[in-house]
Amino acid sequence: RYLPEFREIRSKNIDFIKLCLDENLSSEITLQPLRRFNLDAAIIFSDILMLPYALGQNVEFKKNFGPILGDLDITKLSTFDEIDFVKKIFPVYKAISKVSENELLKNKSTIGFVGAPWTLLVYILNKQSPKKKIKEDFFKDQFLINRILDLLDKFLKIHIKNQIENGANIIQIFDSWAGLLEEKDLPNYVYIPTLSLVDYVKSLNVPVICFPRGISNYKNYCEIVKPDVVSIDYDTDPKKIVKEINHPVQGGLDPKILLTDKENLKKQAVNYLEIFKDHPYIFNLGHGVLPETSPDMMEYLVNTVKDFK
């Protein structure tokens, strides 16, 4: 979102879903950061909401608001099969194939991803971003919730399998709304559904990264879900994480730091690198790059990390 070459493409392609389904443009966007920076991996340009879209739910992205979803007809999904699903988002897999075969990815990783079942359930039923809380009556129809979670488990695994078969050699699971749940609800809605996906990815001999954004107990999460790597957000204390868990860790740096100056950026980045110097660690931000970020600051950050000893 912060690269001028991306903005040029985006300005000519207003429909975000159509852009994700254009294998040539989505693969080009995926490769753009690698042309500028010495990165170790590329994450495919797509969206976690491609899954409800592929299941027949209308998904639109409204400027300065976010996603708006229509109704999901659960009755139709009883006859919906893998062929129907894959056909609807096949260009996503074609884009992954194009990216993974590109010379820029030689000796580097191609990251595919999905939304976690809980986060997708929130979008499917809430029909938009919940911001800081979900509706009071969200859990009223437990039968419907369980049915949707079962469907998500089935089709998320199909989505994961197709990404891997087309060249993704890492899968990341984004649980953007995990932090909305109380601790007592995490087992049913986060731990168990995500563990099912993690076990599936591991069965395909591919490493899996999980990002349970906003949760407070990473220790429990890692012990139960057992991701190969856990991503932390910028509200998480990295010193506490180092003491609590043995799992490899990714991320943490607040994207807003990139909007300050180079001296402060270096100080904050080196702080993370020092904290995790004796712990398996993948340097990354604790959330997405902000659109107003200068590419020069990103280049400075990448070089700072690469030069750290």
Predicted regions and their residues:
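Active-site-proximal, glycine-rich beta->alpha crossover segments in alpha/beta enzymes
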Residues: 56, 60-162
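Conserved, mostly hydrophobic/aromatic
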Residues: 34, 99, 156, 163, ...
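Active-site mouth loops of central-metabolism enzymes
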Residues: 12-26, 133-158, 254-264
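Catalytic-face loop-and-helix region of soluble metabolic enzyme cores
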Residues: 3, 202-309
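Alpha-helix-loop-beta-strand connector modules within alpha/beta enzyme cores
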Residues: 90-107, 184-206, 243-247, 301-309
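Short glycine-enriched loops at secondary-structure junctions
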Residues: 1-2, 47-49, 65, 114-129, ...
